[in-house]
Amino acid sequence: MSLLYHKQNQELSSGVRLIQDVNASNSPMKYTAVKVLEFSADSSYEETLEAFEAGIVVLEGKVTITADDQTFEDVGQRTSIFDKIPTDSVYVSTGLAFGIRAKQAAKILIAYAPTNQTFPVRLIRGNIHQVEHRGKYNNKRLVQNILPDNLPFADKLLLVEVYTDSANWSSYPPHRHDHDDLPAESLLEEIYYHEMRPKQGFVFQRVYTDDLSLDETMAVQNQDVVVVPKGYHPVGVPDGYDSYYLNVMAGPTRVWHFHNAPEHAWIIDRQ
């Protein structure tokens, strides 16, 4: 089974298009799933969560989100993903229904993780994101943490946005988090939702294990998804194009501890 999922662009309902729907039924992922929707003006979507929690991330535009008798209006902070403004999200717990209504065009990512635990519905405004500039040389990226492991707002879900400029690498040097060996390393699946600027661009992503029993290198296009059930997973961005991806992570324990590939760890220590 390939780890690369191309854009679907399927009409789901009036004014709502399904761009991605990656889950346990069509992928090797057990702990993570993702859905990406594009809304025309005056369109809506509803869903009921059963044995899953969800993080609803407003990638572009503004929407109204309802869940558990709560209504959040004007959720969203940017007209384009590449505005690089931290956006708004809503966390919804298992057993609840939610609705999304768009007065204008919008793009939404819904991240899922299986759980039987309940947490309060929560609006996560972009202005509380932990923003980091990581790396040096040609290994620089902008990181916007939506739902990191130090915010106790979810049972399993971790969410983060990463911007990588032209001719840089990210998720690099290669690291993995597929061993349940805390505190050294946590077992977390990971899903990448990719976009590029300009849209005709592509990035390269390699997913591989130490023994190379898994070793897949992909040319990833705009709005593609890459799933990482295990292994290292670096991303390279060609000259002339900028990269965005949103990471969905989940596993047995909601902690992100990773292991760098030892043969490439020297890259971190360069002066």
UniProtKB/Swiss-Prot annotation:
Isomerase recorded as keyword: yes
Lineage of the species this protein comes from: Bacteria, Bacillati, Bacillota, Bacilli, Lactobacillales
Species, as recorded: Lacticaseibacillus casei
Superkingdom field: Bacteria
GO function terms (MF aspect): 5-deoxy-D-glucuronate isomerase activity; glucuronate isomerase activity
Function per UniProt: Involved in the isomerization of 5-deoxy-glucuronate (5DG) to 5-dehydro-2-deoxy-D-gluconate (DKG or 2-deoxy-5-keto-D-gluconate).
Name of the protein described by the UniProt record: 5-deoxy-glucuronate isomerase
Pfam families for the chain: KduI
EC number of this enzyme: 5.3.1.30
Family designation: Belongs to the isomerase IolB family.
PANTHER family: 5-DEOXY-GLUCURONATE ISOMERASE
Pathway: Polyol metabolism; myo-inositol degradation into acetyl-CoA; acetyl-CoA from myo-inositol: step 4/7
